[in-house]
């Protein structure tokens, strides 16, 4: 994983995420990284004083994460059905992980589950990378609260793949 340079994205994103937390003065004491891979983002958050946790479907990835950061809690699980008992201030799912969920109902299940283990006022930050291969469709807005709004843009390409892009402000 790291030998191929795939650690670049979580390292770059981790720095940007910490800057966003500082700039927005967001209170983040606990975090969960879905599809955490080798745990790079968890490590970055842990070193920033956040009680970080991670999960991944790959036993091999979690073994590496545990070896590199034994002080961080990691689970081997499927993010479609994952429902930890603990709640978190921040849940992340980056590195194109949601693009691997091919059924829109399963994407919905992930969002429902995240909502269940996200503390009130918490943040779910994720990415979906594939904007060049999908046609444009009308986005829709959701108001989560008076201060937090999100725009979702759901598209389907010619192969039937579902894509979801979001902007939160």
Predicted features along the sequence, with ranges:
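SAM-dependent methyltransferase
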Residues: 125-169
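A short glycine-rich, Lys/Arg-flanked "PGG" loop and its adjoining helix->strand segment in the class I
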Residues: 108-120
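Conserved class I S-adenosyl-L-methionine
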Residues: 1-27
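Class I SAM-dependent methyltransferase SAM/SAH-binding core
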Residues: 32, 39-81
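A short acidic, Gly/Pro-enriched loop at the edge of an enzyme's catalytic core
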Residues: 83-90
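A short His-aromatic
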Residues: 99-101
């Amino acid at each position: 994983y790291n030998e191929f340079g795939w650690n670049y994205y979580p390292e770059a994103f981790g720095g940007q995420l910490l800057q966003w937390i500082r700039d927005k003065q967001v209170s983040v004491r606990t975090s969960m990284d879905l599809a955490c891979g080798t745990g790079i983002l968890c490590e970055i958050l842990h070193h920033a004083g956040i009680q970080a946790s991670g999960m991944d479907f790959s036993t091999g990835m979690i073994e590496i994460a545990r070896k590199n950061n034994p002080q961080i809690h990691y689970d081997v699980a499927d993010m479609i059905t994952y429902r930890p008992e603990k709640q978190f201030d921040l849940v992340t799912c980056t590195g194109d992980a949601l693009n691997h969920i091919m059924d829109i109902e399963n994407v919905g299940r992930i969002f429902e589950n995240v909502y269940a283990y996200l503390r009130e006022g918490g943040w779910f930050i994720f990415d979906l990378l594939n904007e060049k291969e999908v046609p444009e469709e009308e986005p829709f807005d959701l108001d989560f609260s008076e201060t937090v709004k999100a725009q979702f843009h759901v598209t389907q390409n010619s192969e039937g793949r579902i894509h979801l892009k979001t902007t939160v402000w």
